[in-house]
Swiss-Prot record:
PANTHER family: HISTIDINE--TRNA LIGASE, MITOCHONDRIAL-RELATED, HISTIDYL-TRNA SYNTHETASE. The keyword Hydrolase does not apply. InterPro entries: aa-tRNA-synth_II, aa-tRNA-synth_II/BPL/LPL, Anticodon-bd, Anticodon-bd_dom_sf, His-tRNA-ligase, HisRS-like_core, HisRS/HisZ, HisRS_anticodon. One of its GO terms (molecular function) is ATP binding. This is Histidine--tRNA ligase. The gene is hisS. Its EC number is 6.1.1.21. It catalyses: tRNA(His) + L-histidine + ATP = L-histidyl-tRNA(His) + AMP + diphosphate + H(+). CDD domains: HisRS-like_core, HisRS_anticodon. Belongs to the class-II aminoacyl-tRNA synthetase family. It comes from Thermoanaerobacter pseudethanolicus (strain ATCC 33223 / 39E) (Clostridium thermohydrosulfuricum). Homodimer.
Length: 418
């Protein structure tokens, strides 16, 4: 057990980490052009934040949170999602007092105790964006656009955007009465979880993936038929923004998401090539969450995207992430003096921005050159007593095998100019 990662976790080795770096770099580029600023929140929070924010009827709170009592007697939870901590930071640091909206993004590990399966680990990584302070449906459309832009730039084109409105507390109260009346006649056929949801938050029954529950809810009354004028207008406005951007979408009344804080907009983006497990992004609006967590009455909207699931989706679609280029220069040496000299030379060239490697294993010259090939080095030089004396080396282009003699002082500029 000592040499094995805990169940539901995974090491990201160098053979895979370049993929993460590429995606995270693209995320940062996209968020920058959209005007989102990065926020980093702690890995754990007071449990009460998630009880109030995520909602006590959710599977996350009821079954999946990693909660413990610390040495000070406080109930602490490893964060299971990114929105509530971002809201807490927004309130704690009085960001609501600044000119709005506040546009944030994060890339963070999150923790949920659930059955490990493909794309769903107990520790996984989430990319999310949040817009606080904007009630217009244009903010909803903007966060959707961020997600769609990332997915399309990664090469995922066969996407399906599904949208819904889950209403506000006023119109949802009326809908819940109608829904409970509908479900009451089939209560015995609902799964045990949905029997609890029926009492606490019946809307969540629509989100159940159990087949017997889905058979019942497929004939359930549609929440879109019970929206108040404000929610209906907001949903229509969102569709206009999506239309003007040229995004195809499907109105799906079953999209309610698995968190209690959603109001009005709820959406999912699905990779159609993958099928039922193809949801790569989900989010929506949460106009009551900031106030629920102790802040002022301010609207919010955002999404979360699991990076493990995204990487699997790319792989299943045959999309390869470009591997990083090899080192710029490998410096081989012969002799003890050259060993010290090349160490200093490598350090100088690295400081000036070149990717340089040299041998730290005291290999033979032949073995050093073999190592240079393994590193996919673009260029290589060999420095020995004669090269140090003459201040000249043969710069070998490892890609084509050609050589050119240059002074040691020319190495940096010559490589940068090629």
């Amino acid at each position: 057990m000592l040499t094995k990662a805990p169940r539901g976790t995974k090491d990201i080795l160098p053979s895979e980490s370049y993929k993460w770096q590429y995606i995270e770099g693209l995320i940062r580029e996209i968020c920058d052009v959209y005007g989102f600023k990065e926020i980093r929140t702690p890995g754990f929070e007071h449990t009460e934040l998630f009880l109030r924010g995520v909602g006590e009827s959710t599977d996350i709170v009821r079954k999946e949170m990693y909660t413990f009592t610390d040495k000070g007697g406080r109930s602490i939870t490893l964060k299971p999602e990114g929105t509530s901590p971002a809201v807490r930071a927004f309130i704690e640091h009085n960001l609501y007092a600044e000119t709005q909206p506040t546009k944030l993004y994060y890339i963070t590990p999150v923790y949920r105790y659930e059955r490990p399966q493909s794309g769903r680990l107990r520790e996984h990584h989430q990319f999310g964006v949040e817009i606080f302070g904007a009630k217009s449906a244009s903010a909803d459309a903007e966060v959707i656009s961020v997600a769609m832009t990332l997915l399309k730039k990664l090469g995922l084109n066969n996407l399906e955007l599904r949208i819904n409105s889950v209403g506000c507390p006023v119109c949802r109260k009326n809908y819940n009465k109608v829904l409970k009346e509908f479900l009451k006649n089939n209560l015995e056929y609902l799964c045990d979880d949905c029997k609890v949801r029926y009492e606490i938050n019946p809307l969540r029954v629509l989100d159940c993936k159990v087949e017997s529950c889905q058979r019942i809810t497929k004939d359930a009354p549609l929440i879109t038929d019970y929206l108040c004028d404000d929610c209906k207008s907001h949903f229509e406005e969102l569709q206009k923004y999506l239309d003007i951007m040229g995004y195809d979408y499907i109105i799906d009344p079953r999209i309610v998401r698995g968190l209690d804080y959603y109001t009005k907009t709820a959406f999912e983006i699905i990779s159609k090539d993958i099928g039922a497990q193809g949801t790569v992004c989900g989010g929506g609006r949460y106009d009551g969450l900031i106030e629920e967590c102790g802040g002022p009455s301010m609207p919010g909207v955002g999404f979360g995207m699991g990076l493990e699931r995204l990487l699997i989706t790319l792989e299943q679609n045959g999309i390869e992430i470009p591997k990083p280029e090899g080192v710029d220069l490998f410096i081989a040496y012969v002799g003890e003096e050259a060993k010290l000299f090349t160490f200093a030379l490598a350090n100088k060239l690295r400081f000036n921005g070149l990717k340089v490697e040299r041998d730290n294993m005291d290999r033979s010259l032949k073995a050093q050159m073999k190592y240079a090939n393994k590193l996919n080095a673009k260029f290589a030089i060999v420095i020995g007593e004669e090269e140090m004396k003459e201040n000249k080396v043969k710069l070998k282009d490892m890609r084509v095998g050609s050589e050119v003699e240059i002074s040691i002082d020319e190495i940096e500029q010559r490589i940068k100019n090629i």
